[in-house]
């Protein structure tokens, strides 16, 4: 990460896409996408997804590391080009507990991530706990971040410290997505970004963390990009001009969250304006969902009814029977909720792919289609972009390849935005 940031600060048009997903096909897609380049691949886990208690994935930080390394080994991706990051590391998961207890768990969270070899650490203590006022005083936020940083510094060995980097600040919705519709989004004021940096500098120095300050590479801000279930707010460079100018006077860059579904030109403009770390998550699993839905339509055309996977029906049954991951986010009427379940841009279906019934039905779908020839016309009908790539000779028509390539459509847009020389 340090090299990428240094090159950006030296004037090179260079950024990095942060892949925020625990789905094996998404991770495989990201690693295959850059397999034959010299690029680093940044894969991040969030604190509610992966923590010392297992998170909603059931993985502790060391488990997630081994999970990613296992996929890397399968596809032949070198570990030295992998960067593992931890996002929203702080009291996020324990906001309903008193601050002292939540921070105690947050310290253990940080230690677990750093000990597992995660080198990009987002220190996020911005959320109020059960006995805190709302919002928290910025100095309290910074001092709590310093406590977390101290835990990281004490855990890292000398070799790890060479690669260890920190991200500070937050200007993002609740991790996991917006719970309501959005009409507009507030662009961070440069004075607030400056205050974030100043308070963290004071707090770190109070705690004897002067050296750690040199590892702070980025500040999380809101440049004016967001999405909810049905809408996308696109980047407007002129609205973020002052913010973009301010960071040039520092040794840091910005990190932008919720950049999913922006245009490839917007990604290029964001990197130009020093939002050099672009986080993406739901757009990747949305593309995965589109691919599986498309393959299910092909299955309906090619496989006899009694042999079909019924994957779309199984998804509906599971999500309606177990609505915990979507109920409070989606619209209340049944017809609207079904549209959201299937097609929402926030893609809360992503929480259900590991479910045993859904996983088995997806496996059967792929097995069924592996046993037949996929007609080009059928691929053109349901996956027209992949049909073009087949025609160009850069893709072979297996179900697995079609899914991977569909996910990589998203990554192609980020590469256009982040790469110095693009066609």
Swiss-Prot record:
GO biological process: D-tagatose 6-phosphate catabolic process; galactitol metabolic process; phosphoenolpyruvate-dependent sugar phosphotransferase system
Similarity comment text for this entry: Belongs to the GatZ/KbaZ family. GatZ subfamily.
Record Pfam families: GatZ_KbaZ-like
Single GO cellular component term: plasma membrane
Pathway(s) where this gene product acts: Carbohydrate metabolism; D-tagatose 6-phosphate degradation; D-glyceraldehyde 3-phosphate and glycerone phosphate from D-tagatose 6-phosphate: step 2/2
Subunit structure: Forms a complex with GatY.
UniProt keyword Calcium present: no
Function as written in the Swiss-Prot or TrEMBL entry: Component of the tagatose-1,6-bisphosphate aldolase GatYZ that is required for full activity and stability of the Y subunit. Could have a chaperone-like function for the proper and stable folding of GatY. When expressed alone, GatZ does not show any aldolase activity. Is involved in the catabolism of galactitol.
PANTHER family, per the entry: D-TAGATOSE-1,6-BISPHOSPHATE ALDOLASE SUBUNIT GATZ (PTHR32502:SF12), N-ACETYLGALACTOSAMINE PERMEASE II COMPONENT-RELATED (PTHR32502)
Organism annotation: Salmonella paratyphi B (strain ATCC BAA-1250 / SPB7)
Entry keyword set: Galactitol metabolism
Protein name: D-tagatose-1,6-bisphosphate aldolase subunit GatZ
InterPro entries: Aldolase_TIM (IPR013785), GatZ/KbaZ-like (IPR012062), GatZ_KbaZ_carbometab (IPR050303), TagBP_ald_GatZ (IPR023436)
Phylogenetic classification of the source organism: Bacteria, Pseudomonadati, Pseudomonadota, Gammaproteobacteria, Enterobacterales
């Amino acid at each position: 990460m340090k090299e990428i940031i240094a090159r950006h600060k030296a004037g090179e048009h260079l950024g990095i896409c942060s892949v925020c997903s625990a789905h094996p096909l998404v991770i495989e897609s990201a690693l295959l996408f850059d397999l034959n380049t010299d690029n680093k691949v940044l894969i991040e886990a969030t604190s509610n997804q992966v923590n010392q208690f297992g998170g909603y994935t059931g993985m502790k930080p060391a488990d997630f590391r081994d999970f990613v390394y296992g996929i890397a080994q399968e596809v032949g991706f070198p570990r030295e080009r992998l960067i593992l990051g931890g996002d929203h590391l702080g009291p996020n998961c324990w906001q309903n507990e008193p601050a002292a207890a939540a921070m105690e768990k947050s310290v253990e969270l940080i230690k677990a991530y750093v000990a597992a070899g995660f080198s990009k650490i987002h220190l996020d203590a911005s959320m109020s706990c059960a006995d805190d006022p709302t919002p928290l005083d910025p100095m309290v936020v910074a001092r709590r971040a310093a406590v977390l940083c101290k835990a990281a510094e004490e855990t890292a060995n000398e070799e790890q410290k060479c690669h260890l980097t920190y991200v500070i600040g937050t200007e993002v919705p609740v991790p996991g997505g917006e719970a309501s519709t959005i009409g507009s989004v507030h662009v961070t004021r440069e004075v607030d970004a400056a205050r974030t940096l100043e308070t963290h500098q004071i707090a770190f120095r109070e705690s004897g963390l002067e050296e750690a300050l040199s590892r702070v590479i980025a500040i999380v801000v809101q440049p004016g990009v967001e999405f909810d279930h049905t809408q996308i707010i696109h980047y407007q460079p002129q609205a973020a001009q002052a913010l973009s100018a301010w960071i040039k006077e520092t040794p840091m860059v910005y990190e932008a969250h919720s950049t999913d579904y922006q245009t490839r030109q917007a990604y290029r403009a964001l990197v130009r304006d020093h939002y050099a770390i672009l986080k993406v998550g739901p757009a990747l699993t949305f593309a995965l969902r589109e691919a599986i839905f498309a393959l299910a339509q092909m299955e309906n055309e090619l496989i006899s009814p009694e042999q079909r996977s019924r994957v779309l029906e199984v998804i509906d049954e599971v999500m309606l029977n177990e609505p915990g991951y979507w109920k409070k986010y989606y619209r209340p009427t049944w017809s609207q909720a079904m549209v959201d379940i299937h097609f929402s841009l926030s893609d809360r279906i992503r929480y259900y792919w590991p479910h045993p019934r859904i996983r088995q039905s997806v496996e059967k779908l792929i097995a069924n289609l592996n046993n037949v020839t996929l007609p080009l016309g059928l691929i053109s009908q349901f996956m027209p972009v992949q049909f073009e790539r087949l025609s160009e000779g850069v893709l072979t028509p297996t179900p697995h390849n079609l899914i991977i390539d569909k996910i990589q459509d998203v990554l192609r847009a980020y590469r256009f935005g982040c790469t110095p020389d693009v066609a």
